[in-house]
Amino acid sequence: MIFLWSGFSKDVKYLIQKYIISMVSKNQIKFISSLHLKKNRIANQLFIAEGVKVIQELLKSNFILEHLYCTEPLFDAVQPNLKSIISESDLKKISALTTPNNCLAVFKIPTSMPIFDKGLILALDDIRDPGNLGTILRLCDWFGIAQVICSEQTVDLYNPKVVQATMGSISRVNVSYVNLKSYLQNSALPIFGTFMEGSNVYKENLPKEAIVVMGNEANGISQEIENSIKKRITIPRFGDLQLTESLNVAAATAIILSEFRR
């Protein structure tokens, strides 16, 4: 076997290695799966990203790749020692998704960046749904919002479903977790809050620099944070029956940010 292997050219050896399916050990499966939980992500300073689009975006950014697992040869630019071809059954074992994509990557959690306390800033008060947070970060990327401030109760940025929903925008928006009450009290920027009752956002003369607070999916902005709001704004309803209780927080964020950017 050694003789046969030595008889192959360098290029042929590369192609053989490229297409060999690696076995993922039980310990590897256990470790990668453990990163689905926040406490293990924090302990190991690692998180997972799934899908070609998301992984491509992260590879182009300053995120550092720990290892890449794919069911087919992809990402030729990634060093061979940092990637493995694995079976679909093994991918299902390590994926956080109900229907896994064809690749999963483990990245290092970067060091927190300083807060950019200028321009238009979005503050999130206790957003709990991973899909909502991911979509909101994608919206911030679209509208050029460089800084998002999250309350300490907001869902973890590196939750696999958050990362997936950002579609790579996680690499272009600075997200900081703080004591939101203290942050707002110490900021010199005007603070706007979204409520069911408030000034019609379409009729407001909105500033270029401000903090916009979006509240929890079920309860809105908490009383503690409400006390720091300087201006209450609302998205008016136009339906005749007026039966819809509220907008999804991500949908509301899209409308609000669009108005601030007009």
Q: Language-model segments: which ranges?
A:
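Amphipathic alpha-helical repeat scaffolds
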Residues: G51, R128-T135, T244-A250
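Structured adenosyl-cofactor binding patch, chiefly the S-adenosyl-L-methionine
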Residues: W142-F143, V162-S171, Q223-R262
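Glycine/small-residue-rich loop that forms an oxyanion/phosphate-binding "nest" at active or ligand-binding sites
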Residues: S84-K108
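RNA substrate-binding interface of SAM-dependent RNA methyltransferases
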Residues: K60, P114-E197
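Active-site/ligand-binding-proximal alpha/beta "capping" segment
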Residues: G193-L243
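Boundary-proximal intrinsically disordered activation/regulatory segments immediately upstream
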Residues: Y19-E72, V155
